[in-house]
């Protein structure tokens, strides 16, 4: 189970968070961001699944929270539900850390968001599944500032 990348984009397609676990050129990254947004933005939350076939034997697992799309590109043979739950776990940690997280928190506290992401995912793998452990580590990091 390995991630290729994680993207958080708003409804307009602005990328608020991007973490790349596979080597892509800058041109490829821009192209992938656009392709992912075009795939997930028009989908109906009520009647369509949160999994979309992508290219090169990969798929996009995504979840929409308010105006943000949290997207993960995973191998086609990986368990989609595990990554869907990992995305939800990441958002729960963000919610608890920031107190009802919003898009502005991602923009102005991006370094903290990347720290949280690095606590949950390491080298494209799900690393930590305990919310309390992640929040305790983040408290320790906050004390260092």
Swiss-Prot record:
Pfam families registered for this protein in UniProt: Clat_adaptor_s
InterPro entries: AP_complex_ssu, AP_mu_sigma_su, APS2, Longin-like_dom_sf
UniProt superkingdom: Eukaryota
Subunit structure: Adaptor protein complex 2 (AP-2) is a heterotetramer composed of two large adaptins (alpha-type subunit apl3 and beta-type subunit apl1), a medium chain (mu-type subunit apm4) and a small adaptin (sigma-type subunit aps2).
Compartment list: Cell membrane; Membrane, Coated pit
Organism: Emericella nidulans (strain FGSC A4 / ATCC 38163 / CBS 112.46 / NRRL 194 / M139)
GO CC list: AP-2 adaptor complex; intracellular membrane-bounded organelle
Keywords, comma-separated and alphabetical: Cell membrane, Coated pit, Endocytosis, Membrane, Protein transport, Transport
Lineage: Eukaryota, Fungi, Dikarya, Ascomycota, Pezizomycotina
SUPFAM superfamilies to which the protein is assigned, alphabetical: SNARE-like (SSF64356)
Protein name as it appears in the record: AP-2 complex subunit sigma
Gene Ontology molecular-function annotations: clathrin adaptor activity
Gene Ontology annotations of biological process type: clathrin-dependent endocytosis; protein transport; vesicle-mediated transport
General function of this protein: Component of the adaptor complexes which link clathrin to receptors in coated vesicles. Clathrin-associated protein complexes are believed to interact with the cytoplasmic tails of membrane proteins, leading to their selection and concentration.
Lipid bilayer topology: Peripheral membrane protein
Family from the record: Belongs to the adaptor complexes small subunit family.
């Amino acid at each position: 189970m390995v991630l290729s990348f994680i993207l958080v984009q708003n409804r307009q397609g602005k990328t608020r968070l991007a973490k790349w676990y596979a080597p892509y050129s800058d041109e490829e990254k821009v192209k992938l961001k656009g392709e992912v947004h075009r795939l997930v933005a028009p989908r109906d939350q009520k009647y369509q699944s949160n999994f979309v076939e992508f290219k090169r034997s990969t798929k996009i697992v995504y979840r929409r929270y308010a105006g943000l799309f949290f997207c993960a590109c995973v191998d086609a043979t990986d368990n989609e539900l595990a990554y869907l739950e990992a995305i939800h776990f990441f958002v729960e940690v963000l919610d608890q850390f920031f107190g009802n997280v919003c898009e502005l928190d991602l923009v102005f506290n991006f370094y903290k968001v990347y720290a949280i992401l690095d606590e949950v995912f390491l080298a494209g793998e799900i690393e930590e599944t305990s919310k309390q452990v992640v929040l305790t580590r983040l408290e320790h990091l906050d004390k260092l500032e």
